[in-house]
Amino acid sequence: MNAEKSPVNHNVDHEEIAKFEAVASRWWDLEGEFKPLHRINPLRLGYIAERAGGLFGKKVLDVGCGGGILAESMAREGATVTGLDMGFEPLQVAKLHALESGIQVDYVQETVEEHAAKYAGQYDVVTCMEMLEHVPDPQSVVRACAQLVKPGGDVFFSTLNRNGKSWLMAVVGAEYILRMVPKGTHDVKKFIKPAELLGWVDQTSLKERHMTGLHYNPITNTFKLGPGVDVNYMLHTQNK
């Protein structure tokens, strides 16, 4: 497993990276700042595995892997997983946790654009979860993901819709009222409307296959997937 440093790339927001570097040591604390990620991970994993026809024996790339929550769970499903992130500290946490868990994941500090220049068409599945809203040029990430997946392979994106409801739920509610995530985690101006994401997808070799919303019920304190993409949503695409 590696956590290699790489040259600075244009599509990096160092303020965004610093946010996650500051709390990286608590990435695997089930009651800490990343509790929501742990809570929704089974939903994400189930959606990805079902839509991709299983993960066993497949070569998978997790773009913006952070501390490795999704990457590890996909490796447990029998996938050969590479995790990309530009945060050095989150990758160190991911690397150590994988060692402790006996899980093999290859962690690399590199942008997805740099990775695509070297490994085009190498992956059966590419995942990019809650990462697009943290980079200056999300369309560039979509292009790179399309380049990295094999013909017929699957690419999954998740992000936040940009509207008043998502601001109330993801920023006011999650950060300030319920304190589910650290204040300042999200910038509503960087949220992405589904039509925008689909427009970027249409300019690549990817084709939309399915879209679903991720919903939180504060009364029951539960998450579920279902219709409605007005706040969090996931998109399944496939390389033509």
From Swiss-Prot:
A Pfam short name:
Methyltransf_23
So, what pathway does this thing act in?
Cofactor biosynthesis; ubiquinone biosynthesis
Protein residues bound to S-adenosyl-L-methionine: 44, 64, 85, 129
> What does the record give as the reaction this protein catalyses?
a 3-demethylubiquinol + S-adenosyl-L-methionine = a ubiquinol + S-adenosyl-L-homocysteine + H(+); a 3-(all-trans-polyprenyl)benzene-1,2-diol + S-adenosyl-L-methionine = a 2-methoxy-6-(all-trans-polyprenyl)phenol + S-adenosyl-L-homocysteine + H(+)
Q: At the top level of its lineage, which domain of life is listed? A: Bacteria
The record, for Gene3D superfamilies, names: Vaccinia Virus protein VP39 (3.40.50.150)
Assigned EC number: 2.1.1.222, 2.1.1.64
Coiled coil stretches, renumbered: none
| Entry keywords, A to Z | Methyltransferase, S-adenosyl-L-methionine, Transferase, Ubiquinone biosynthesis
Q: Which GO terms describe its biological process?
A: methylation
Q: A single GO molecular function, which one?
A: 3-demethylubiquinol 3-O-methyltransferase activity
Q: What's this chain's function?
A: O-methyltransferase that catalyzes the 2 O-methylation steps in the ubiquinone biosynthetic pathway.
Task: Provide the family line.
Answer: Belongs to the methyltransferase superfamily. UbiG/COQ3 family.
Q: What is this protein called?
A: Ubiquinone biosynthesis O-methyltransferase
Q: Which organism is it from?
A: Escherichia coli O127:H6 (strain E2348/69 / EPEC)
- State the encoding gene: ubiG
